[in-house]
A protein has these predicted regions:
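Gram-negative bacterial Sec-dependent N-terminal signal peptides
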Residues: 1-23
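A compositional/structural signature for long, glycine/proline-rich flexible linkers
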Residues: 23-506
Length: 506
């Protein structure tokens, strides 16, 4: 009898405990961690999300898919800037009449502020051409002796090869052979050989001034630069040089939803493995796929406009206020480096930390040309860049105010140094009544201080007696500046030489 009663008590107790557990876990048989349960209402930055036992409501699902597509459109904008930028450059050349690799845009009178080029310089004699390896196959580039830093980049602005003083010819001139992607045909001897990952490739050469003039570099291009398909080695097409100096044309990618049309053109042109599956998938998620129509519906058109607007705004935030400490060259100055992390592939800790995507966006929203020679320490050979857009107090430059920059004596630059002013909107040379918004120690006769330093002045009007050292700015327009060091020497790298911050003069 007692035994039966004890069994009955145990059963009742078990049922009560089971009922208690069921109640506390929402009809589950076991205790469920709250961290894996989705509440029926969730407050987020995109609004209130409603669920029924974990299933999103129809309205919530629409909200989430709109947000997902906007995030992807934004990511595509930020990560595909190199691709869109190269396409805009190609189209800019095409509109200037350059459609074949033997046609070279030559800035025989330097690059002034008329064309829209991302932070182009006013200091070297540019020669620019596009290679089409799909049409022409392996292509030969012959460069003359004495060339400055010269580079070939692929259609994603990835490094293919250097030439000239920083290339394997070491400034002695030479013959280069650029092979198409996946090429497995014969490769003749006698060339510096590189294989590109894309059909479209940009050749950009820099010639140095001699006695402040372009003549020597221009003559060198005319007599020594040759670009032709290897298949036409015996009957090379005649070189054509088209002047870009003083011309008005655009080479900058769109900042609105036309951006996606630019990258669609590239995706259709290039081989499928031009970008990796993950990047292809991200781009395909917004409707862009090789060989297929890109026809976004009304909903997606609105999302693409929004994604481009957010991506563009974010790229500008990264450019003007990078949040990584190693963006700044010196602890006590507001000068930023061009290559955050000092790596032309933007790898963190030699790749252990992956790729710094923000640093890559920062660079390509502001600039073009990607080469180790601009990022690595190359004493007396490469080039280094310092960018500044605010005073020591952290105030962005105002084109209606006056500023001063001191360049200390004994500038550690073997070839030359220069300071160029740029437009914060276009990231191109600032357009003023001065055709060249810059000062260059080999071209301009500037007034030195008794200690050998040089004071440069920025403002809408020249300070009295300082006209030779003045760079004009525009009221109600922002600007920033880049200090270039060609052939940088050890004091640049060890920090024993550095420019002042730019200070307001009242």
């Amino acid at each position: 009898m007692l035994k039966t009663q004890l069994k009955r008590v145990a059963l009742i107790t078990s049922l009560l405990v089971s009922s208690s557990v069921m109640a506390s876990t929402g009809a589950y048989n076991t205790d469920i961690p709250s961290s894996i349960i989705t509440p029926d209402k969730v407050e987020t930055s995109i609004g209130t999300l409603n669920f029924k036992d974990g299933v999103p409501s129809q309205q919530t699902m629409e909200m989430l898919y709109n947000n997902l597509d906007t995030m992807r459109a934004t990511e595509v904008f930020m990560n595909a800037i190199p691709m869109a930028s190269m396409e805009a450059l190609r189209v800019g050349h095409e509109k200037m009449g350059l459609t074949n690799s033997n046609q070279v845009m030559l800035f025989d009178d330097l690059m002034d502020s008329n064309p829209l080029f991302l932070t182009g310089n006013t200091d070297t004699v540019y020669a620019s051409a596009f290679l089409d390896l799909e049409r022409d196959g392996p292509t030969v580039v012959e460069i003359p002796p004495g060339m400055g830093p010269t580079t070939v980049n692929d259609a994603f602005f990835r490094f293919v090869t250097d030439m000239g003083v920083v290339g394997p010819d070491k400034g002695q001139g030479g013959k280069y052979l650029i092979l198409p992607p996946n090429y497995d045909g014969p490769v003749p001897e006698g060339y510096h050989v590189s294989q590109s990952t894309s059909y479209t490739n940009w050749f950009i050469a820099r010639g140095f001034l001699k006695d402040g003039k372009t003549d020597a570099a221009v003559n060198s291009y005319h007599t020594g630069l040759k670009i032709y398909p290897l298949a036409k080695k015996g009957e090379q097409p005649k070189m054509e040089f088209i002047s870009g100096s003083g011309k008005s044309f655009n080479t900058i990618h769109a900042n609105d939803d036309h951006f996606y049309d630019e990258i669609k053109t590239v995706i259709d042109k290039e081989p499928i493995d031009f970008i990796d599956p993950e990047m292809r998938g991200l781009i395909a998620a917004i409707g862009i796929q090789k060989g297929k129509p890109f026809e976004p519906d009304a909903r997606m058109q609105k999302i693409l406009k929004d994604g481009a607007a957010i991506g563009n705004a974010t790229a500008r935030a990264l450019m003007f206020n990078p949040r990584t400490e190693n963006a700044y060259i010196w602890d006590d100055r507001n000068w930023k480096t061009a290559f955050i992390g000092k790596d032309y592939q933007w790898l963190i800790d030699e790749g252990k930390g992956g790729r710094n995507l923000d640093a890559r966006t920062y660079f390509f929203y502001m600039a073009t040309v990607n080469t180790p020679a601009m990022a690595l320490k190359m004493i007396g050979k490469g080039s280094q860049y310092a960018i500044v857009d605010k005073t020591a107090e952290g105030k962005f430059f105002d084109g209606g105010k006056n500023y001063k920059l001191t360049i200390p004596a004994n500038v550690p630059a073997k070839n030359f140094w220069s300071v160029v002013a740029y437009d914060t909107q276009t990231r191109s040379e600032l357009q003023t009544s001065q055709p060249f918004p810059s000062k260059n120690d080999k071209r301009d006769k500037m007034v030195e201080n008794p200690d050998g330093s040089v004071d440069l002045y920025f403002g809408p009007t020249a300070p009295k007696g300082k006209e030779a050292n003045w760079i004009q700015t525009v009221p109600n327009k922002g600007w920033f500046s880049i200090l270039r060091m060609y052939g940088p020497l050890e004091p640049w790298y060890d920090g024993s030489w550095k420019p002042s911050d730019i200070t307001e003069v009242k």
